[in-house]
Regions:
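Conserved post-Walker A coupling segment in P-loop NTPases
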Residues: 116, 130-198, 206-222, 287-292, ...
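Short gly/ser/thr-rich secondary-structure transition/capping motifs
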Residues: 17-20, 193-199, 235-240
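Conserved catalytic network of the ASCE P-loop NTPase/AAA+ motor domain
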Residues: 27-29, 57, 133-134, 161-165, ...
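Nucleotide-binding/hydrolysis machinery
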Residues: 120, 154, 165-167, 242-252, ...
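Conserved RecA-like P-loop NTPase ATPase core
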Residues: 127, 131, 149, 172, ...
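Conserved AAA+/SF3 P-loop NTPase catalytic/coupling segment centered on the Walker-B
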Residues: 179-184, 206-235, 251-255, 261-273, ...
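Dynamic helix-loop-helix/coil hinge segments at AAA+ ATPase domain boundaries and subdomain interfaces
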Residues: 105-126
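N-terminal accessory segments that target, anchor, or regulate ATP-driven/P-loop NTPase machines
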Residues: 1-111
Length: 383
């Protein structure tokens, strides 16, 4: 039934849930609680005083009612928008891209503030299950995968599921910070340690104390700094630039890379000892083309991302969904994000059609040709 399907989808995303009346689970859930009523519109009167009392008693902040598309459900009291209902226009018992899209579109109504990994592919669901187990450890994790496959989302999920979730999560792009500034940014510096150091700086490692730090694109870190990072990981101390004092830190270190690290070691671009210190538990993210079942779920997430609290996201037609699933996605999720944003702009209706799906290789970087490619979509004359 609806309930089993929803619970299965929540499990795939690594989202905790509890059944009504499960007081033990209710006490352990986050402060912002949601109630899902599925396929029970005839049995549950959300307008009753009894229901109102139940919401206050359990500190439930939002109610989402899932009903079949053929049903009508009149909610007389909106509770300032706290009660919403979502019509399911497809049969959830059928396996289809449309079913996956609408189910995940429904889940996005109340998962906006919850860190989770939109997915429907069995391998991705297995990855989420692994991450939930791994989150309980303080071990370093090296996340490897092609650009645009969600490595930072994986890192955020590890942090959100850990005991450190209420502490800082700091991401550092090792490729974006100049080499002469990276050591100071990471480990801090004392006042006067170098020209321009007008005041002391604690550094990102100390700023993330008790929390998690993500070293994004760790393979781009200069060799001279790798040895200092190795000592930080081994001894759990940092030494600010211009100081001889070691400062203890309690921190979990995650790292990402899109390179083959063994090849980087052989080319003397990365220290072997640092690799093994980071690679306590390796995790890999796959290219989007190898997990097409995730595409409807990710598309639903992208369409609801910028919608206001009481707004309605656009939907994808069956033809548009099929077009997305059949694409190769060389740019992975980043490319999918671009295509979805483009489709939202081009679509004049609430439903995005297959003609609104324009891939990057359909466009050029020449303004005239780009305008001509979009001209039929926008229905305007160009120059």
């Amino acid at each position: 039934d609806f309930s089993q399907i929803i619970c299965c989808a929540l499990n795939k995303r690594g989202v905790e849930w509890s059944s009504l009346g499960d007081e033990v689970c209710t006490q352990t859930l986050s402060k912002e609680r949601h109630l899902i009523i599925s396929d029970t519109s005839k049995d549950c009167d959300v307008n009753s005083d009894k229901f109102e009392t139940y919401l206050r008693l359990h500190k439930i902040t939002k109610v989402v009612v899932l009903v079949a598309n053929s049903e009508t459900f009149d909610i007389k009291v909106k509770r300032n928008g706290a009660i919403k209902y979502f019509h399911m226009p497809v049969d959830l018992s059928e396996l289809s891209h449309a079913k996956s899209f609408y189910l995940n579109l429904f889940l996005e109504q109340f998962l906006v503030k919850h860190v989770n990994l939109p997915c429907d592919d069995p391998e991705t669901a297995d990855l989420v299950a692994l991450l939930c187990k791994l989150a309980g450890s303080n071990a370093s994790v090296l996340i490897n995968g092609p650009t645009g496959t969600g490595k930072e989302v994986v890192a955020k999920l590890l942090h959100a599921k850990s005991a450190r979730k209420d502490e800082a999560f700091i991401a550092v792009n090792c490729a974006a910070i100049p080499e002469n500034m990276l050591e100071s940014m990471l480990f801090g510096h004392e006042k006067g340690a170098f020209t321009g150091a007008l005041q002391s700086n604690v550094g990102l490692f100390r700023a993330a104390h008790s929390g998690t730090i993500l070293l994004d694109e760790i393979s781009e870190m200069p060799l001279t700094l790798q040895s200092k990072l190795l000592r930080v990981l081994q001894e759990k101390v940092v030494t600010p630039v211009g100081s001889t004092k070691e400062i203890a830190i309690d921190i979990r270190v995650l790292a990402t890379t899109n390179r083959n690290m063994l090849q980087e070691i052989q080319a003397n671009n990365f220290r072997e000892d640092l690799f093994y210190r980071l690679n306590v538990f390796p995790v890999s993210t796959c290219a989007l083309k190898s997990r097409p079942l995730d595409i409807p779920a990710i598309a639903a997430h992208l369409l609801t991302r910028n919608v206001s609290e009481n707004g309605t996201p656009k939907i994808l037609s069956t033809e548009a969904l099929n077009k997305l699933v059949q694409h190769e996605w060389p740019g992975n999720v980043r490319e999918l994000d671009n295509v979805i944003q483009r489709a939202e702009i081009l679509s004049c209706a609430n439903e995005i059609g297959h003609t609104d799906i324009v891939f990057d290789n359909d466009l050029t970087f020449r303004p005239r040709n780009t305008f001509e490619a979009l001209n039929s979509k926008l229905d305007v004359k160009v120059g």
